Amino acid sequence: MSSPPSRRSSGADPLRLERSIPAEALDAIRAPFLSAGAAPVDAPVLQPLGLLLDLAGEAMRSRLFVVSGDGGEEACLRPDFTVAVARQHLSSGAASGRYLYEGKAFRVAPRGSDRAEEFLQIGVEAFEAADPVAADAEIAALAWAGAAAGGRDDLTLLLGDVGLFAAFVDSLDLTPPLGARLKRTFSRPRQLKAELEGDAAPAAATERSRIAALLAGLPEAEAAAVLQELWSLAGIEPVGGRRPAEIAHRLVEKAEVVKAGRLSANQADKVRAFLAVSDAPEAALDAIAALAGPNRAPLDAAIEGWRKRLAGMVAGGVPAERLVLNAAFGRAFGYYDGYLFEVRSAALGEERPVAAGGRYDGLPARLGSETKTGAVGCMVRPARAYAGGGE
């Protein structure tokens, strides 16, 4: 037995449902997905809470409906299907697979919002070693076809790419620790702002710490042992219940931030200019290419891949004039590690995407897979796609 789901942010009211849509409209929206060559799958509604938070980030907790089991373990109602389907694929032992799902997902609406909290999604998740650029184009075109089948004439396909930002950062020829740190901030606006303003590396405070500098070159277990020995020699007992390993970890982190360095003013300006790019894709790619640093080969390769991806989308039926590439576009779910997109309606606004998807090649490994394969998928919200609906 499990306790009822707890509402993280809006009291104990029943889940807010979305509007139903006519059967013929749902059939039209579903049709492109039925022709995508995917096997139907029924993913479990309950998913491990800890796993979702590890993958999506602690900030996602407030959007999840949590269920506590008799054994004390916590689960949540699936907020989407990607992780649930990926787990099923891995448990099957298949080297590759393409799956079609249709079912309800659940998210707590933001306080004061009228968004539905239980809503229908139709989608495809593909775990294949095929050409990733071609697969990306196919999946984006599939999402567009499903979204457009609802009859809306105000749709835009917004594109972004975590990998494009990574390639741009590589072009700047930063120290490896600084480059890695900057890449991690892409979907964390406050941390990114701190990097750009030079607040992420408080040199004056940490460079004075000789202990931190000493520990920085040691493995963490060894650093903890050294710290424990120093305390013993000085007759000091740590306060607050913090263990030597925890304190050593924080000291090492601080020292490594200093060693990694900061962005120069010119580099920070380039990053700001990159993040400001939002235009028709070809113009956006030209603007990004003009910002490349001295090590431009990775960025040039990423841009060439994007030109092929765009050609594939247009060939797959996406109108070129409906495409927008936004260099700063990211998603709340931290497991997306490549290109990503949303189909947006002008009438519904950016907070209510009609369809969404992207590439998450790293997710299977994070779920325990030892086989490296591509992973990409998309979903559509039929109630939003339907021209006579909305939520």
Model-derived regions: residue spans:
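Positively charged, Gly/Ser-enriched RNA/tRNA-binding surfaces
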Residues: S2-P4, E18-G37, V41, Q47-P48, ...
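Glycine-/proline-rich flexible loop or hinge segments
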Residues: S9-R16, R61-E74, I122-F127
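Polyanion/phosphate-binding surface patch
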Residues: P44-A75, R115
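Proline- and acidic/polar-enriched loop/turn elements at helix boundaries
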Residues: V45-L46, L159, R181, L325
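Short low-complexity, flexible loop/linker segments enriched in glycine and/or proline
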Residues: L55-A59, S171-D173, Y339-F341
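Acidic, His- and aromatic-enriched active-site or binding-groove loops in soluble protein domains
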Residues: R61-G71, D173-E207
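Electropositive, surface-exposed helix/loop patches at the edges of structured domains
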Residues: E74-A94, Q191-A205
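Internal, well-ordered domain-core segments that constitute the primary functional module
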Residues: Q121-A194
